């Protein structure tokens, strides 16, 4: 039994929290901005737990969708489903159960949040299949990973103002930046098996495209800060995020696999910088 649970834990990437963190940071930015400071504890706990559950569900359904591709990729061929250690139906069941628990968490929230949660679930569930035909599936991932933003505003304000959509667009650019670096790790394998990624689509302009996406992210988050009249700590946080992006350039410019993966993981700190600036800006108001 314990061995089975360990396989399920690997399926949902409990040992690899970076995906959860990249999903969590934009949600926390939005919660603080929507509430004008720390949100209600109940709302915070719902979104915190929901982030973990939905990322876990997304990993399970992603492995189900990619089970025939992952066996040809060095980094993924030993995943439990790909290696035949768990069945496809188990992955689907786990994803469904986790998604249902996540939806149950938001039942105390308003109807707008619930409807947005349905849209978010559809986007998250369909993302793995976009790699078959969409040239830049990372943009769709950005919508999936950023949908906590409009949901947070809906939960706190019972509306989704323009600033939420600006932040969602910013998150799309951020996701394209960090996930292109991630896709550069697997590019050779992905070319062989026919999966589409932004790293393949951008080709020799991959590094330039990543840096342009970081720039677009910073500009849009700056616009959000202006719209919300955020104080100097927010801009310090955004400047620190820009420094992180510059550091990522030094990691990816030579396209070394391990350094590209390090750049992807380091985006956790970029997200943390934006959150720290946001939290302090509201704390000293």
Curated annotation (Swiss-Prot):
GO terms for biological process: ubiquinone biosynthetic process. Keywords: Cell inner membrane, Cell membrane, Magnesium, Membrane, Transferase, Transmembrane, Transmembrane helix, Ubiquinone biosynthesis. Pathway: Cofactor biosynthesis; ubiquinone biosynthesis. GO terms for molecular function: 4-hydroxybenzoate polyprenyltransferase activity. InterPro entries: HB_polyprenyltransferase-like, Prenyltransferase, UbiA_prenyltransferase, UbiA_prenylTrfase_CS, UbiA_sf. It catalyses: all-trans-octaprenyl diphosphate + 4-hydroxybenzoate = 4-hydroxy-3-(all-trans-octaprenyl)benzoate + diphosphate. Catalyzes the prenylation of para-hydroxybenzoate (PHB) with an all-trans polyprenyl group. Mediates the second step in the final reaction sequence of ubiquinone-8 (UQ-8) biosynthesis, which is the condensation of the polyisoprenoid side chain with PHB, generating the first membrane-bound Q intermediate 3-octaprenyl-4-hydroxybenzoate. Belongs to the UbiA prenyltransferase family. This is 4-hydroxybenzoate octaprenyltransferase. It comes from Cupriavidus pinatubonensis (strain JMP 134 / LMG 1197).
